[in-house]
């Protein structure tokens, strides 16, 4: 199995779909059970062998993500003084060998899923394969292989990239980007196709392994394009499409886990119900 030790997680933005609560709680910090959304991805990546995580955060203070992954000495002292020292371990959110690096993104700059990836790659001169996860969703699979491990296991050479495909009922494909797959490789992503025209029932949930070559292509795409004062986004899928059309390989990994999306109220409630074992009507 190829070893990948670096991951990028974009968590910047106002989370406007979740206003007004996101005025005071960052979207990626919305609670699922007793943990924030983003921590499910962080712990999964650590379990898969990642030791350096590059978080692209908003350039506002305070940064709740940074606070969550930092020691709180005042809280620890309080717990100890009240005879609750056994709870100090619950405040340790990162093992000692893992480091989170923070990159601040201006909300008024270029935007889209490619931008934070390019920012992290340039800021830290990344020139090796990296895992990319978004910060407001995760794969729930407590008894099985993690999605990150499935992605890594799908690679057959150091030049391969990979994308995670999540299987859903065919009648729901018209809400997603659907993967077109041939011999285990991605050939296209069809956005919101009709049920009849969908090439599969595997959807894109924006979880990738990017080879060093594809990572550089994403950096170039963001730097070389200027969409000006428009609403056009710098989508990570654009350089990915260009990359595979050049004959490069993006493997398609699958997971037996459940995709949980906290980006909407309904998805967030469902994620809490699943994680907490609450039966839904």
Residues covered by each model-derived region:
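Well-ordered alpha-helical segments embedded in enzymatic catalytic cores
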Residues: 37-40, 115-119, 239
């Amino acid at each position: 199995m190829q070893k990948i030790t670096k991951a990028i997680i974009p968590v910047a933005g106002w989370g406007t779909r979740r206003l007004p609560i996101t005025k005071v709680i960052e979207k990626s910090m919305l609670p699922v059970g007793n943990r924030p959304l983003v921590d499910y991805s962080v712990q999964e990546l650590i379990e898969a062998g990642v030791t350096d995580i590059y978080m692209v955060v908003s350039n506002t203070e305070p940064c709740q993500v940074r606070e969550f992954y930092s020691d709180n000495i005042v809280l620890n002292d309080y717990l100890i003084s009240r005879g609750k020292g056994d709870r100090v371990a619950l405040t340790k959110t990162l093992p000692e060998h893992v480091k989170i690096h923070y990159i601040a993104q201006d909300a008024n700059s270029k935007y889209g899923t490619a931008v934070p990836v390019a920012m992290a790659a340039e800021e830290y001169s990344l020139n090796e394969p990296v895992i990319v996860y978004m910060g407001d969703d995760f794969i729930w699979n407590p008894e099985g292989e993690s999605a990150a491990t499935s992605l890594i296991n799908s690679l057959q050479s150091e030049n391969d990239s990979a994308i995670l495909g999540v299987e859903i009922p065919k009648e729901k494909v018209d809400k997603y980007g659907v993967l077109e797959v041939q011999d285990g490789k991605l050939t296209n992503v069809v956005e919101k196709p009709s049920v009849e025209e969908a090439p599969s029932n595997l959807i894109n949930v924006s979880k990738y392994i990017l080879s060093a070559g594809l990572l550089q292509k994403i950096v170039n795409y963001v730097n070389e394009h200027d969409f000006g004062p428009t609403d056009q986004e710098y989508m990570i899928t654009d350089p990915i499409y260009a990359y595979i059309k050049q004959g490069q390989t993006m493997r398609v990994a699958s997971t037996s886990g459940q995709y949980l999306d906290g980006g909407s109220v309904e998805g967030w409630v469902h994620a809490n119900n699943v994680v907490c074992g609450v039966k839904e009507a």
